Each structure stands twice: as structure tokens, then as C-alpha cells.
Design a protein with these regions (language model features):
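Active-site-adjacent substrate-binding region
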Residues: 231-248, 255-257, 304, 314-363
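N-terminal capping segment at the start of a domain
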Residues: 2-30, 125, 313, 373-374
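Active-site metal-coordination/substrate-binding segment of hydrolases
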Residues: 68-156, 164, 386
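Short glycine/serine- and small hydrophobic-enriched flexible loop segments
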Residues: 144-151, 235-242, 393-396
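Midchain, well-structured core segments that form catalytic/ion-binding scaffolds
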Residues: 99, 108, 113-115, 121-134, ...
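Zn-dependent metallopeptidase/amidohydrolase metal-coordination segment
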Residues: 264-266, 341-390, 394-398
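A non-catalytic alpha/beta surface segment that caps or lines the substrate-entry region
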Residues: 24-77, 81
Length: 405
């Protein structure tokens, strides 16, 4: 008898897999390898062959039903880590059958109010001191439950390829991805939110560091001599559009996000995230930073400002549109599950963005998790169960279309 997705999910969120942007290790935290090894043991108990790499990438595969070996492989991917923005250690979860109103989160003073359509459904919440970890342990739980059920029910299927990656939250989920070893030419990430969601358009992303060199002097005799790197950095920031920041943008609007700053009189740094859905707009944003630095260097007659820009990932839409059947099959699988599908923008990135750019088209599917990266994160059990059914249907759709072809 397959394990319910809820009990599997509750086991998974007990693992502390918060990633770290500063450790310099791969994986960035040891808990991710611990979880990968535990999941490998689960797969082997199902009779599924799998391997875990030194960097905590897990790969599993279920061979095709006899006679269907030549069908194209279906790949499913989720990530092991949780956000470094909020603690994911010692998660105290509870399951509430929601009948309306606010759900209090322990003694934290925080509350959650799910959408009205969830009345009568089971909601998994925390005590308000940690995130829940539905991003992305809901995706992992759903994939594992799908694998268990497709084997238990002896449903005919083509080759199935599974991957769980580390460090997605810090942008390193695909750093050591074994494309050839994975063995699928296309896949889906399960890293979305609301039931029915299919995402294949995400931000173009870049990171910029603005370095400001100052000149220190004794404050009592600094007139005409001191060049304060901190106030110069503030002036640089003032040249950027004040409304184009995360807290004032939505939909297709891009932004400049000052995510970190440090410094003293002699030296200061500003770290920015640049985000937009349009490639031309991304170039404009980069050029604005460079122009601001050039303007201030001329104004102060010194080479005080330097801008370093590095691309992070691209909008995967251009890659997914070349294989439209991926979204069409997902739509069909959802409709068979009684779910109304919809497309939405990812105001962020997923492993799928980098995978798609590197030749593995990979749209993103829903998991039934909400409020990611926060202490008010929650998951809907009935939606998680629907996600498992969607995956079963997806395997059917892939098989049916391939056989007809």
C-alpha cells in the first residue's frame, strides 16, 4: 500500500535542508546530503535504482513497461533545499481542517487565511517560527508518491527519470547536473504553487556589484580631502528609478533590488539583483548602472565607481515555446484530474530556467504549496493529492501520444 502524500511530506519537512549562500561547499549544507541519502533508501525499498552524487544530486529511474521501452522518457525534478531567508530547522507542523477565518500559527501572533475554495480542506501550517518547507518538499513528496503508485498499480508507462537537486534556492541547483546521466530530453520541475499552475516564463536575471572607492581623512580636517564612499554609494542608488523595486512592482514589471550593502569611508559595496522578463530591458538596466557609474566618475573627477555584472539565468519561454507539447500535455493531465489549468509568470527563477537553456526543456508545475520563503508558508493536502494524480495522468498522456505517433 503506497504511503499517503501527507505522511511522506511531514517526514520530509523534519529534515533541515536550508541552503547557504556563504558556505562555498557543494552541497552548501550537509542536511541536503542527509535527505538525498534517505530518499535514495526509499527508492531502493520500492525497487527503483538510484544514485546520489558527492554533491547530493539524486538520480532515479523506473524502466518502461515491457513493450514501451522506445517511448521518450518523462523527467520529473524537484529540489532538496529550503530558502536561506527563514529557518527550516525543527519545523513544528500541524494539520488543520479549515472551515474559514484565520488560522493562528502557534503563539507567534501570525495567522494564515487560505483561499475560500479551500474550505473543508486540510491545511498544513507551522507554529510561526519557521518556514514549512513545501518549497520544495511538497514537490519531492508528490514525485515519490507518484513513483510508488505507478509501480503498485502496474500502470503502463514509458521510461521515467527522476532528479532531486541541491541548492536551487541559491542558484546552484544545476551546477553539477548530469544531463547525459539523467537520460531524458525534456522534463518538468515540481516547484510551483497553486493547483493548476503551469509556468514556463520567468525573469531574465543578473547580479550587479557596485564598488565605490573612497578617501579617508580626519573628520576635523576633511574639507576638500575626504571622499566618503558610503555617501557616494547612496548618491549612486539615488540615480536609479525609485519605483522600480520589488515592493512596487508586479506582473511583467522588472526591478532593481538592492539586496545588500556594506562599507565605510574608504570603501563601499552595493549588491543588486536585476530582474525583467524582456532581454532588451535587461540590457537597458545594465547600461543604466554603467552610465550612473560613468556620470559620477566624471562628476567627481575620479575613478571611484566600478560596476561588475554577471548573468544568472534567462527567461525559459524562448526554449519552451519550441516544444509546445510539454505544456499541452500538462494541460491535458490536469483536466483529467478535474483541475482547471492556467499559466502564470514566475517572478523569480527555477532550476528549469537553466536546464532549459542547456538543452533540457523544463516547464514548472504546481505543488499545492503557498507563501514560500516565509513563516506563513502553508500547503493544502487535497491539492498535493491532486498533484500526484496529475503526474499519473501525465505519464498516461505521454504514453498515449507516443504510441499514437
Amino acid at each position: 500500500m503506497s504511503e499517503p502524500v501527507l505522511s511522506r511530506f511531514l517526514r520530509l519537512i523534519a529534515f533541515d535542508t536550508q541552503s547557504s549562500e556563504t558556505s562555498g561547499l557543494h552541497p552548501s549544507t550537509p542536511g541536503q546530503k542527509v535527505l538525498a541519502d534517505a530518499l535514495a533508501a526509499e527508492f531502493r525499498a520500492m525497487g527503483v535504482s538510484c544514485r546520489v552524487t558527492e554533491q547530493a544530486c539524486l538520480y532515479a529511474e523506473i524502466p518502461a513497461t515491457e513493450g514501451l521501452e522506445n517511448l521518450p522518457a518523462l523527467g520529473l525534478i524537484a529540489h532538496l533545499d529550503t530558502s536561506d531567508a527563514v529557518s527550516g530547522k525543527d519545523v513544528r507542523a500541524s494539520v488543520v481542517t479549515w472551515e474559514g477565518g484565520d488560522i493562528p500559527l502557534g503563539k507567534s501572533g501570525l495567522t494564515v487565511r487560505p483561499p475560500d475554495r479551500m474550505k473543508g480542506m486540510r491545511i498544513v501550517v507551522t507554529d510561526g517560527t519557521t518556514l514549512l518547507g513545501a518549497d520544495d518538499k511538497a514537490g519531492i513528496a508528490e514525485i515519490c508518491t507518484f513513483c510508488e503508485r505507478i509501480l503498485e498499480e502496474k500502470r503502463p508507462h514509458g521510461p521515467l527519470k527522476i532528479a532531486f537537486t541541491p541548492d536551487e534556492e541559491i542558484g546552484e541547483g544545476t551546477l553539477f547536473f548530469d544531463y547525459a546521466g539523467f537520460g531524458a530530453k525534456f522534463a518538468y520541475t515540481l516547484d510551483g504553487g497553486a493547483i493548476g499552475g503551469i509556468e514556463y516564463e520567468n525573469f531574465h536575471a543578473a547580479r550587479a556589484k557596485v564598488c565605490v572607492s573612497g578617501l579617508s581623512a580626519h573628520p576635523g580636517g576633511a574639507k576638500g580631502r575626504m571622499f566618503n564612499a558610503q555617501t557616494a554609494a547612496m548618491e549612486f542608488h539615488s540615480l536609479l528609478p525609485p519605483a522600480e523595486v520589488p515592493e512596487h512592482t508586479s506582473g511583467r514589471e522588472g526591478f532593481y533590488h538592492l539586496c545588500a550593502m556594506k562599507g565605510d569611508v574608504s570603501y563601499a559595496e552595493l549588491d543588486y539583483l536585476l530582474r525583467t522578463f524582456d532581454s532588451d530591458d535587461m540590457e537597458n538596466r545594465k547600461n543604466l548602472l554603467l552610465s550612473a557609474a560613468s556620470f559620477l566618475n566624471k562628476k567627481y573627477k575620479r575613478e571611484a565607481f566600478r560596476v561588475e555584472i554577471a548573468d544568472q539565468y534567462r527567461n525559459m519561454r524562448e526554449f519552451i515555446e519550441k516544444v509546445p507539447f510539454l505544456t499541452e500535455y500538462a494541460f491535458e493531465a490536469m483536466k483529467r484530474a478535474g483541475v482547471t489549468p492556467f499559466t502564470s509568470l514566475i517572478r523569480g527563477g527555477t532550476d528549469g530556467a537553466k536546464l532549459s537553456r542547456n538543452g533540457l526543456p523544463c516547464p514548472n508545475l504546481c505543488t499545492g504549496g503557498y507563501g514560500a520563503h516565509s513563516r506563513t508558508e502553508f500547503a493544502c493536502v487535497e491539492e498535493m493529492e491532486s498533484c500526484v494524480q496529475i503526474l499519473l495522468n501525465l505519464a498516461d498522456v505521454f504514453r498515449e501520444h507516443a504510441v499514437r505517433a
